[in-house]
From Swiss-Prot:
Keyword ATP-binding included in the entry's annotation: no
Subcellular location: Cytoplasm
GO biological process: 'de novo' AMP biosynthetic process; IMP metabolic process
Gene encoding the protein: purA1
GO cellular component, one term: cytoplasm
Pfam families assigned to the protein according to its UniProt record, in alphabetical order: Adenylsucc_synt (PF00709)
Single annotated GO MF: GTP binding
Transmembrane residue ranges: none
Catalytic activity: IMP + L-aspartate + GTP = N(6)-(1,2-dicarboxyethyl)-AMP + GDP + phosphate + 2 H(+)
Subunit architecture: Homodimer.
Binding site for IMP: D12, E13, G14, K15, N37, A38, G39, H40, R138, Q220, R298
Biological function: Plays an important role in the de novo pathway of purine nucleotide biosynthesis. Catalyzes the first committed step in the biosynthesis of AMP from IMP.
Protein name according to UniProt: Adenylosuccinate synthetase 1
Family under the similarity heading: Belongs to the adenylosuccinate synthetase family.
Amino acid sequence: MLTAVVGLQFGDEGKGKFVDYLSGNINNIARFNGGANAGHCVQHGNLRGSFSQLPASLNKKNLYICQGALISLPILVKEIDFIKKEDIDSHIFIDPRCHIVLPLHAELNRASEKYKGKQKIGSVGVGVGACVEDKANRHGIRLIDTFDKEKLRSKLEFLWSIREKQINHVFNAQASLDFEEMLETTHQYGKRIEPYFTFTNEIIGDLLNSGEDVLLETSQATFLDNSFGTYPYTVAYQTLVQTCFAMIGIPAQKMHIVGVMKSYMIRVGNGPFPTELSTEQADYIRERGNEYGTVSKRPRRCGWLDLSLIKHAVKLNGVIELAITNVDVLAGLDEIKVAVAYEIDDKLVCCDNALLQLDRAKPIYKTFKSWSTLNSSYTDLTELPIELIDFLSFIQDYTGVPIKYISYGPDRNQTLVVK
């Protein structure tokens, strides 16, 4: 059976921790979308890993990168080297149909953002958006193209001829890359990962047909989806969990979907954020939650939990249980607020409507008492402070979905499973 982990906010909800946690009982973990524009951090004891290409697991498992994923070769190789260095003897399978995010894409991305000025999206500048453009325009470079250096040269020359003109003459920047160096580096990295090449759709399809469990890791999050998110302040692809079937290449089927959410809201980059805090409360949350980008290292914008968005994300993805993270971060505040509805021009609006004009939406809040500093270990829900239990109960009632997992620290073991 398929189990999928999906983010219900703007990313950085803690999906990596729950992929790692759930992988303790599932041998096959697959990543099917996104690229190195977002990282998932996992920690077990003194071992800490950050993954933006490989599935986020510190367990010895079968790891699959499916054809919908976008590959930054130096980062992928670095992650492979990390798990080998730490003696995490996972078996890695990479689909050769994955498209490559080139240094040229990153340079184009940065030039585009600079050119847009105040209209910029706030991209981390990895180049994923430009890679998606090339894939859609049918002149992208895939992993399979790295085998033959002369074939790779021909494809890169064509792509270079288009993108260099765009950088120099459209965005008024100056392309600074060395073509021959990019060609050689891409070819050598391709040779390095060639032993892992596999048609992952066939393996995963066979596993599911034989009754095996497969855990899916969704990159980014619901409201960064370029159709249902806060467009245009989104990523360049779809992030809803049901896109997995096309991105992997398997038939649609039943899934067990775990929605991951933080106990507050964060956002990286530009875009509307109705519950954003600009007070010392934001600094308190940011420092206690270490809210700095895994990839960009930029300070994340912080705000109160927005349950209108969470409930909408639950419906969009078909979530059947929730995992909530960072409840320890809110401990010690005088009070905690939760947005339960929106007003625009003094009229209540539904979430779909609000998302079209979220910069104008005024949140309506419910206020909760905070709780004291949490312990280092819990075994039962009743051991938690009553104020936290009230907070969690309200989330369950509002969303209509049970909270199954409560994370109260970064370590894998700092997770309470609600029975």
